[in-house]
Design a protein with these regions (language model features):
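Bacterial carbohydrate/catabolite-sensing allosteric modules
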Residues: 3-178
Length: 178
């Protein structure tokens, strides 16, 4: 979303409601989105119930709503006496050579994390990258490295081996109800 789109929507007939977690500078539309703090809390409760005591977060940090989710996750962990390691994922699409370079950096990061560890990722795509890195390192998922996505893309989650678990943000339902 950008300013040109916001201007176009402001001139449109009818009501405009932003159902995206993305914020458009200068746009003043009513916004209805998923509760990212509640999603982070659900993730933490699930991971603690599974016995994990080491936590990490892997996501592109160039988007304000991802930063909000990360900060909620870290704050809630700290309130419970835990810390969280962070690896910034690159944003946008990457040529193959850049992907391979980033994947190696991801492998190094995961290798150095205390085990067992639970890694929360912003998207299923990032979760898949973590699962690939674990496979390359010979680490078992979810026994040594649990991977939990922050969005429930059923197709992507189901095609990962092993399947990726995710927190359902109910974004589609929010859009219909708005």
């Amino acid at each position: 979303a950008d300013r040109a789109m916001a201007r176009h929507l402001a001139r449109a007939r009818g009501r405009v409601v932003n159902v995206s977690t993305a914020r458009v500078p200068g746009a003043n539309f009513p916004t209805v989105t998923a509760d990212l703090q509640a999603a982070a809390k659900l993730a933490i409760e699930h991971l603690l119930d599974q016995g994990f005591r080491h936590f990490a977060y892997y996501a592109p940090m160039n988007l304000s709503f991802v930063e909000d989710h990360h900060h909620s996750f870290v704050k809630l962990l700290e309130e419970r006496g835990y810390t969280c390691s962070l690896l910034h994922a690159p944003g946008g699409k990457r040529p193959d050579k850049q992907w391979q370079k980033q994947q190696k950096a991801l492998e190094r990061w995961i290798r150095d994390l205390p085990k067992p560890v639970a890694i929360l990722t912003w998207t299923g795509r990032r979760g898949r990258e973590v699962i690939y890195a674990c496979r390359a390192l010979g680490l078992s998922v979810p026994e040594q490295v649990a991977v939990l996505g922050a969005d429930d893309d059923a197709l992507l989650c189901g095609t990962c081996i092993p399947p990726l678990s995710a927190v359902a943000l109910t974004s589609e339902q929010i859009g219909f109800e708005a």
